[in-house]
C-alpha cells in the first residue's frame, strides 16, 4: 500500500502486519508498518482468491478462509463465517474499552479517554447530552 489508509483496506497488508506484529491493532497500521520491509515482503506473497461458495453465503455471513503454506510443505488453514465484532461473535466490553482507549489516547490524554469511555457507555441514560458535548468541545480547543 502507498499509505496508511490503503493499508487498512489491503488484505495482504492486514494479514502480513498481523503475522509480523502478532497484533492487528491500530499500531499495526502506522507509516512505520507500511514501510516495514518484513511486512512488505510477506504481503507480497499473499494471494487473495475469491471462493464462489463463500461468496454465496453473503450477505447473511461474511466468510473467509485462510491457507498458509509453510516452507517445509505443511499447510495450515482456517475458516470462519463471521468477522469478530459481528452479532454472531460480538466484542466483549473489555475488548471495546481496550480498542476505544487505544484509538482515543492517540489524540487525547489517557485519563480523559477513560472518563469519556465511561460516559459514552452510559449515553443512553443521560437526561442531557450537552455536558458531554461541551467536554468534547473543550478537548478540541
Region spans (language model):
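Terminal-appendage/accessory-domain detector
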Residues: 1-141
Amino acid at each position: 500500500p502507498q499509505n496508511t489508509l490503503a493499508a487498512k483496506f489491503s488484505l495482504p497488508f492486514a494479514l502480513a502486519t498481523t503475522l509480523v506484529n502478532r497484533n492487528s491493532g491500530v499500531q499495526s497500521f502506522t507509516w512505520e508498518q507500511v514501510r516495514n520491509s518484513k511486512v512488505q515482503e510477506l504481503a507480497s506473497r499473499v494471494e487473495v482468491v475469491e471462493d464462489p461458495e463463500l461468496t454465496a453465503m453473503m450477505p447473511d455471513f461474511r466468510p473467509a478462509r485462510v491457507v498458509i503454506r509453510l516452507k517445509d510443505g505443511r499447510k495450515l488453514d482456517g475458516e470462519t463465517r463471521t468477522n469478530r465484532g459481528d452479532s454472531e461473535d460480538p466484542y466483549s466490553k473489555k475488548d471495546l474499552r481496550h480498542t476505544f482507549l487505544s484509538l482515543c489516547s492517540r489524540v487525547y490524554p489517557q485519563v480523559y479517554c477513560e472518563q469519556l469511555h465511561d460516559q459514552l457507555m452510559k449515553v443512553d441514560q443521560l437526561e442531557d447530552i450537552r455536558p458531554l458535548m461541551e467536554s468534547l468541545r473543550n478537548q478540541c480547543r
